[in-house]
């Protein structure tokens, strides 16, 4: 007897977050192996995982292709049993998306919180047309309710109604199936067999149990009946399902009738990019060409050579052929809006290969100075939509994002999703909690994991956590955590990628609310969108643009010089001299220790040298062993030659055009692609596949299939095997993270501009960096220290002189002085001027009438405005008080004369006064930190307003007749670091120097003057830890003391031996030997490491517990710590245990 065909329609994937135990792709493969005819993905109130299953059907390893049914399991908030919803056709699919959007977004009255979906049965009925509806019932159910639901479903315009039948394996399955069959007969619906699958293979049962515990916030011991009763909820063979339903064979046959009714596939989504408004009588292409030639007049005064003119015409012709004009007009419009609001922006990525993008003002790479490869941006052969990435100031990017929403409407525009996956740290923490391990144990395991990435924990790491890897519970925790890694945890927003549509976006994919009031995003991520050929616009944020704009503003305000990106003088030899010395702290892209070390070796003297500098310290060139050959050739230590094939296979200069700018060594992605085409003779299709495989680190696993072909073809044509291998290794490195030349050129513009600012205006550069935090490699203490080293005076925070932001004052030397602002005080409330920009722009958007001319809200060509604004979308309600500007406003009325005068005039709460006193901000009033704290303590909790002061005046007793002892300098420095994260009074290490010298520990600056291979001991505060993927497990550490910094290299063996110290120490002692390069770049190669953080804690403990004569009953006030920020009326805390005292801000770790 033949086994009947079977379709499993009740599959829950791991995109039903913390419910499903298997990835959608695993189900496709398992169904193929088991011979299942169709699989129905029905995740809980979401379509987030369906594209992954759809794409996996194209995998060559899936030999038998099951039919994919796209649906969702609707879970209601009104007690209705779950219903599986499968759309029959494209129109019904759109209604399912709109149903889910309603549940995730709400309406004009009710806003749904991020991650929730609140649907009622009546919501489903309103969107039921064209749907195949399957009612699922719990183990125990009320027949009357079920019959009522079935009757109401049948009364809709649905394509059909079914009753799901599944076995629960609790001993009463036959009786339960008979009840369900009777119910279906009574309701006149068909019974539909399903295993209500939760995982693809029974081995996943333990992980699914753990997911249940994580979801329910409980442990395996306490979870009880919330777990599945058995391990039967896996994908079963048609034969097994037929056996289980042998008494109800029609329920099995009905699964195929059900599947055959569904005509919808994601192939049917016909994406259309929105039309852009153009002048009357113009087409989009004609308008784009007009803007292009107008840009030629603007950027080149109309005078361009024949080569550039031909390039522009070629690009415009291809844009016309592929019908991309509207897309270019969109990006031009967004950039134009940003510039109209004085928001700096710059395009990057493959778009920098386009001359059209340059003359439209989107990118900044001059096509007359850099060779462009337009085919990398747009290609007729690839048939992939263009992807233009534009960076905006990170502090004002939200204004641009809200403009996009307003411009297109929230039903036509949304941010794409980012899937937050489990990483090793989060996996071990959540699994450990679920298994009942203590917090100490899970924290110890998690703390052995470097960064966010990795494949799990090994026995060595378990031992370093002080645990036994052979312990069954520890072993199980590690095993399950390893399984959980890469599972989706929840959806978040992409950093700025928008999808825009001509018709309603919510008929393509559900849209939900983000955590921020004015943001909405779809359920699909970048890879999903790319797979369906949907075009996106990237509105990205870049902190350096914010910094540069703030620098320009400061220079204009305080020095009377006006600069824009394009006006900064180019090719300044003094700027390049600074970079050749490795002086690049704070400079965009070249401030890491690896880049600082590379600068003296590469010795950049031209803009193109900076392009190479940006690209060369990347996994591609490093893994391909291209860095050292390039440097040797650049420095004249090695002859420049160009790899060539055998004479019978091609000319000797076959690769000259590809490699001549980089001295015969491939450094960029474009070069790797051209080598594949020219030297390995890849077809355009093969080269495109290779390009896609190295597009992001996530696809590293797919690149191996090109290895034999690329290396084999090159060797067969006479290329040196070592060169062929290096080329492929380089391509693999680009798969991890590498820069195309166009992208490096875009970033090199900002490298030069930030370097120019650092050299010529170090005062403004320091101030701009501080006002743009958080960004970059270095903390405020190092930024300030570098500025002072370069001759900039930096002044303390003071209530009589400081503003919210750090600013410039008249200096006594060559540069202005930097006055630290109130924003530097941890926990102090201040509002950024950029937040005010956003509020004003949102209010102006709200004021523009729907359907108004776009000119009313931005610089557009005349055309209708989409009426997509939500009534519930209002400006962000920021309830944070602006203490800083209250001080400035009071100060402008009259100078402060005393602390009581200050408190009365500003009306600040007592907590704000304590923070200011902690920050030593009352010096201009004759009060040091201790005296100010004392006086604040004596003030009443509520300072009266001046009008009522006389009525409530009471005499303040003079509780002490003599001045308080001066606070010692070590105590001052510690207090500074605790409150403002830096100190102008000293460095904590200088107070440990005497002790360290007795231990023969040298200062950081002295490390750089030791002889090669000399053994030394050095100690310092850990500023930065780096473990680049290209460094094969090597860790680079930057240590700082009062004399400067030292670079430490930790080889993998030493890293494993001292993992705890490397990852956890704030102050570390390193013993090792010196290694120096000819360019005088010195490293300390670690051989032994000791965590000396307790010395810092001891310093703080002395400061916090030092006995002083204070009145009985009063405790010495310590600086506030972070956990008191949100409690305005919180009393002063008692002195904490030294291990909990924060001495220094944490290091900045990169991987």
Curated annotation (Swiss-Prot):
It is an enzyme of class 2 (transferase). InterPro entries: DNA_pol3_alpha_NTPase_dom, DNA_pol3_finger, DnaE2, DnaE2/DnaE/PolC, DNAPol_HHH, NA-bd_OB-fold, NA-bd_OB_tRNA, PHP_dom. Gene3D superfamilies: Metal-dependent hydrolases (3.20.20.140), Nucleic acid-binding proteins (2.40.50.140). It catalyses: DNA(n) + a 2'-deoxyribonucleoside 5'-triphosphate = DNA(n+1) + diphosphate. Its EC number is 2.7.7.7. Its main location: cytoplasm. It comes from the Bacteria. It is found in: Cytoplasm. Transmembrane segments: none annotated. One of its GO terms (molecular function) is nucleic acid binding. SMART domains: POLIIIAc (SM00481). Pfam families: DNA_pol3_alpha, DNA_pol3_finger, HHH_6, PHP, tRNA_anti-codon. GO terms for biological process: DNA repair; DNA replication. Belongs to the DNA polymerase type-C family. DnaE2 subfamily. PANTHER family: DNA POLYMERASE III SUBUNIT ALPHA, ERROR-PRONE DNA POLYMERASE. NCBIfam families: polc, PRK05672.1. DNA polymerase involved in damage-induced mutagenesis and translesion synthesis (TLS). It is not the major replicative DNA polymerase. This is Error-prone DNA polymerase. It comes from Bradyrhizobium diazoefficiens (strain JCM 10833 / BCRC 13528 / IAM 13628 / NBRC 14792 / USDA 110).
């Amino acid at each position: 007897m033949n086994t009947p065909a079977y379709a499993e329609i009740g599959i829950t994937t791991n995109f039903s977050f913390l419910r499903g135990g298997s990835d959608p792709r695993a189900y496709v493969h398992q169904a193929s192996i088991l011979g299942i005819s169709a699989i129905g993905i029905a995740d809980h109130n979401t379509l987030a995982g369906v594209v992954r299953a759809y794409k996996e059907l194209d995998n060559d390893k899936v030999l038998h292709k099951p039919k994919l049914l796209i649906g969702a399991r609707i879970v209601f908030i009104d007690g209705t049993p779950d219903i599986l919803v499968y759309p029959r056709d494209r129109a019904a699919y759109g209604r399912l998306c709109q149903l889910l959007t309603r549940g995730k977004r709400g309406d004009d009255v009710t806003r749904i919180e991020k991650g929730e979906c609140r649907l009622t049965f009546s919501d489903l009925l309103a969107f039921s047309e064209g749907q195949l509806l399957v009612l699922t019932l719990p183990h125990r159910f009320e027949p009357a309710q079920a019959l009522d639901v079935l009757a109401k479903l049948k009364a809709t315009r649905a394509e059909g109604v079914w009753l799901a039948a599944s076995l629960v394996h609790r001993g009463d399955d036959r009786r339960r199936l008979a009840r369900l069959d009777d119910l279906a007969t009574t309701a006149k619906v068909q019974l539909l067999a399903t295993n209500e699958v939760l995982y693809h293979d029974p081995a996943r049962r333990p992980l699914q149990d753990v997911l249940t515990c994580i979801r329910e916030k409980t442990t395996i011991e306490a979870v009880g009946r919330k777990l599945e009763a058995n391990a039967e909820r896996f994908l079963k063979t048609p034969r097994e399902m037929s056996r289980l339903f042998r008494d109800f064979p029609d329920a099995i046959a009905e699964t195929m009738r059900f599947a055959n009714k569904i005509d919808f596939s994601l192939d049917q989504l016909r994406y259309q990019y929105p039309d852009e408004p153009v002048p009357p009588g113009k087409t989009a292409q004609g308008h784009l060409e007009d803007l292009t030639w107008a840009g030629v007049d603007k950027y080149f005064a109309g005078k361009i050579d024949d080569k550039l003119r031909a390039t522009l015409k070629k690009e415009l012709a291809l844009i016309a052929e592929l019908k991309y004009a509207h897309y270019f007009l969109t990006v031009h419009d967004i950039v134009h809006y940003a510039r109209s609001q004085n928001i700096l922006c710059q395009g990057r990525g493959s778009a920098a290969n386009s001359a059209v993008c340059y003359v439209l003002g989107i990118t900044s790479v001059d096509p007359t100075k850099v060779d462009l490869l337009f085919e990398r941006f747009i290609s007729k052969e690839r048939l992939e939509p263009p992807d233009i990435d534009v960076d905006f100031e990170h502090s004002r990017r939200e204004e641009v994002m809200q403009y996009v929403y307003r411009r297109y409407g929230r039903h036509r525009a949304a941010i794409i999703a980012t899937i937050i996956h489990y990483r090793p740290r989060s996996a071990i923490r959540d699994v450990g909690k679920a298994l009942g391990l203590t917090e100490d144990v899970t924290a110890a395991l998690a703390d052995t994991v470097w960064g966010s990435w990795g494949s799990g924990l090994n026995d060595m790491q378990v031992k370093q956590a002080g645990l036994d890897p052979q312990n069954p519970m520890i072993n199980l925790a590690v095993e399950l955590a390893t399984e959980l890694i890469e599972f989706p945890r929840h959806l978040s927003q992409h950093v700025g990628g928008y999808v825009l549509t001509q018709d309603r976006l919510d008929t393509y994919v559900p849209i939900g609310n983000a955590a921020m009031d004015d943001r909405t995003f779809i359920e699909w991520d970048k890879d999903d969108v790319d797979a369906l050929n949907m075009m996106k616009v990237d509105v990205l944020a870049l902190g350096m643009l914010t910094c540069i704009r703030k620098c320009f503003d400061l220079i204009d305000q305080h020095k009377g010089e006006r600069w824009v990106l394009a006006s900064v003088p180019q090719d300044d030899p003094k700027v390049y001299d600074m970079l050749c010395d490795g002086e690049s702290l704070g400079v965009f892209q070249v401030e890491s220790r690896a880049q600082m070390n590379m600068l003296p070796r590469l010795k950049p003297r031209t803009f193109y040298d900076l392009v190479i500098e940006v690209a060369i310290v990347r996994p591609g060139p490093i893994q391909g062993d291209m860095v050292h050959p390039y440097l040797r050739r650049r420095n004249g230590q090695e002859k420049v030659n160009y790899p060539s094939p055998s004479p019978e296979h091609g000319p000797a200069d076959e690769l000259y055009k590809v490699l001549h700018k980089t001295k015969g060594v491939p450094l960029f992605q474009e070069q790797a692609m051209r080598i594949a085409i020219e030297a390995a003779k890849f077809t355009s299709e093969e080269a495109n596949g290779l390009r896609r495989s190295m597009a992001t680190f996530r696809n590293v696993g797919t690149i191996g299939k090109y290895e034999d072909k690329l290396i084999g073809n090159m060797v067969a044509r006479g290329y040196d095997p070592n060169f062929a291998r290096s080329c492929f290794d380089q391509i693999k490195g680009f798969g991890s993270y590498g820069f195309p030349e166009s992208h490096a050129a875009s970033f090199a513009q900002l490298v030069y501009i930030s370097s120019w600012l650092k050299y010529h205006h170090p005062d403004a550069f320091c101030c701009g960096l501080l006002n743009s935090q958080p960004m970059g490699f270095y903390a405020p203490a190092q930024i300030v220290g570098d500025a002072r080293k370069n001759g900039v005076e930096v002044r303390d925070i003071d209530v009589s002189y400081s503003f919210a932001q750090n600013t410039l004052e008249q200096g006594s030397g060559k540069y202005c002085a930097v006055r630290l602002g109130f924003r530097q005080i941890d926990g102090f409330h201040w509002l950024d001027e950029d937040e005010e920009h956003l509020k004003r722009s949102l209010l102006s958007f709200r004021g523009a009438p729907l359907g108004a001319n776009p000119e009313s809200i931005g610089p557009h060509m005349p055309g209708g405005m989409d009426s997509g604004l939500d009534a519930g979308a209002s400006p962000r309600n920021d309830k944070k008080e602006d203490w800083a500007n209250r001080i400035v406003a009071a100060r402008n009325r009259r100078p402060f004369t005393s602390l009581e005068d200050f408190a009365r005039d500003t009306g600040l709460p007592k907590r704000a006064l304590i923070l200011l006193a902690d920050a030593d901000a009352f010096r201009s009033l004759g009060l040091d930190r201790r005296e100010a704290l004392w006086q604040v303590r004596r003030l009443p909790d509520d300072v009266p307003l001046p009008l009522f002061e006389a009525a409530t005046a009471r005499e303040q007793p003079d509780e002490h007749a003599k001045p308080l002892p001066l606070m010692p300098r070590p105590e001052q420095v510690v207090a500074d670091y605790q409150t403002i994260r830096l100190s102008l009074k000293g460095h904590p290490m200088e107070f440990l120097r005497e002790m360290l010298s007795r231990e023969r520990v040298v200062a950081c600056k002295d490390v750089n003057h030791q002889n090669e291979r000399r053994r030394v001991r050095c100690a310092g505060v850990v500023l930065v830890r780096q473990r680049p993927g290209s460094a094969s497990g090597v860790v680079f550490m930057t240590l700082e003391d009062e004399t400067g910094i030292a670079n430490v290299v930790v080889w993998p063996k030493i890293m494993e031996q001292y993992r705890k110290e490397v990852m956890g120490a704030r102050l570390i002692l390193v013993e090792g030997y010196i290694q120096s390069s000819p360019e005088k770049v010195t490293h300390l190669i670690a051989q032994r490491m000791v965590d000396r953080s307790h010395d810092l804690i001891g310093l703080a403990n002395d400061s916090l517990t030092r006995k002083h004569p204070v009145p009985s009953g009063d405790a010495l006030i310590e600086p506030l710590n972070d956990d008191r920020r949100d409690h305005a009326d919180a009393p002063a805390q008692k002195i904490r245990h030294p291990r909990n005292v924060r001495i220094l801000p944490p290091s900045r770790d990169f991987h």
